[in-house]
Structures are given as C-alpha cells and as structure tokens.
Amino acid sequence: MPEKMQVLGSRKGLTPAVQNYTMVNVSDNSGAKEAMIISVFGYRGALRRVPYANVGDLVMVSVRKGAPDVRKQKFKAVVIRQRMPFRRPDGTWISFDDNAVVIVNPDGTAKGTEIRGPVAREAAERWPKVASLATLIV
C-alpha cells in the first residue's frame, strides 16, 4: 500500500462476512488475543445498514482480551481470514476455521513480528507488508 492506507471503492458481489460487533481472533504477536470490530473503513451502504468487511479489508477493532497494555484500546486491523465461504474469480469457494485480523500501524505494516495461521491470498495481495510476515498464504 502507498503511504496512506487506501480502501476499495466498489463492494458489489462480495459476501457479507464479518460486520460490526463481530468478535475476531488476533493472529499476530502484538499482545492482543481477541478483538471486536467496531467500524469498517470505506463502507458506503444504505442508512442504518450494518457495515460488513471481507478478507483484505481495513477495519477498526477494540481489543477485548490480551495483554494489559493493549486491552481497552482501538487499533486499525486487516481481516486475513473469514468463516463465511467466498468465491474467487477462478470459481473456487474458500472458507477458514475462524475470523481473524492482524493489527496494523498507520503506515500499513503489521504491529507484530509474526502471523500465526494461514492468510488469504486476497489479503496478501492488498497488504504486501502483512504478507511478508505470513507463514502460509492460501
């Protein structure tokens, strides 16, 4: 990503996966274990419609469980896994065992130094600095 974090404009045809108030696992070693999504960046929907995010989207999370220095704080994060099946352009359907995010800094780099578990290819393509820490890209 360039200096400023960018979000996609069109969301047509995407499967609503994680939305506001969804509890997600934090898959890096930043100290957070579990977080709640509180907003989705770049979402332009109808009035009173709950915003949703997909793999690779930038969200704001509130850390609920983890180390005392990160609990009760808000961070930007990238969705790297979702349980809801989604379709890739080649026609394959993919889903993961959990909903997971990686906490990122304002410049788009991950706050932690390692990512546990697989990372979706869609997230790795949009966030190359996050992909460099991934052990497995699916």
UniProtKB/Swiss-Prot annotation:
GO MF annotation: an example: large ribosomal subunit rRNA binding
CC per GO annotation: cytosolic large ribosomal subunit
Domain of life: Archaea
InterPro entries xrefs: Ribosomal_uL14 (IPR000218), Ribosomal_uL14_arc (IPR019971), Ribosomal_uL14_CS (IPR019972), Ribosomal_uL14_sf (IPR036853)
Keyword match RNA-binding: yes
One record GO biological process: translation
Record SUPFAM superfamilies: Ribosomal protein L14
Quaternary structure note: Part of the 50S ribosomal subunit. Forms a cluster with proteins L3 and L24e, part of which may contact the 16S rRNA in 2 intersubunit bridges.
Gene3D superfamilies reported for this sequence: Ribosomal protein L14 (2.40.150.20)
Name of this protein: Large ribosomal subunit protein uL14
Record keywords: Ribonucleoprotein, Ribosomal protein, RNA-binding, rRNA-binding
Organism (species): Metallosphaera sedula (strain ATCC 51363 / DSM 5348 / JCM 9185 / NBRC 15509 / TH2)
Family designation: Belongs to the universal ribosomal protein uL14 family.
Entry function: Binds to 23S rRNA. Forms part of two intersubunit bridges in the 70S ribosome.
